[in-house]
Amino acid sequence: MAFTRSIALFAGLALAASSAQGATILGGYTQKNATSDDIELLTQATSSANMYNKNVDTRICLIAIENLETQTVAGTNYKFQVAGCPVETDDELGACDDRNCDYSSYNIVIFSQPWSDTIEVTSITPAEYQG
């Protein structure tokens, strides 16, 4: 039930946060409009602590998708910029229950390799604004 709620939440938010797709840069990140599959990947990966790389110690819940870029490697790196709130326990991962929390922007990088059934949150860092 919570998974379905999260998908519905992010589907609406992705429409508001979509941007034009850019040209592919070899080895670099490319802008991408978030699809329902991308939202499902984000929700699945960030809701389960066992999908986090052991070096990722930042834990957040998610409010909105602000941006998405992808990079083709030996699989795909998805760099989601999200609005989220820090959480204390793994039970709070996924969509934020308290949508009035003091949120910030974060970059979440998820590595996906479908043919080996690999999904891993490789980093969560505060987003840096370029201005």
From Swiss-Prot:
Induction: Expressed during infection of host plant and in germinating cysts. Its main location: secreted. CDD domains: CY. A motif (Secondary area of contact) lies at residues 71-75. Glycans are attached at residue 33. It is found in: Secreted. GO terms for molecular function: cysteine-type endopeptidase inhibitor activity; peptidase inhibitor activity. The record marks 27 as: Reactive site. Keywords: Glycoprotein, Protease inhibitor, Secreted, Signal, Thiol protease inhibitor, Virulence. Disulfide bonds: none annotated. One of its GO terms (cellular component) is extracellular region. Residues 1-22 form the signal peptide. Secreted effector that interacts with and inhibits host apoplastic pathogenesis-related papain-like cysteine proteases. Inhibition of host proteases by a pathogen extracellular protease inhibitor forms a specific type of defense-counterdefense mechanism between plants and microbial pathogens. Belongs to the cystatin family. This is Cystatin-like cysteine protease inhibitor EPIC3.
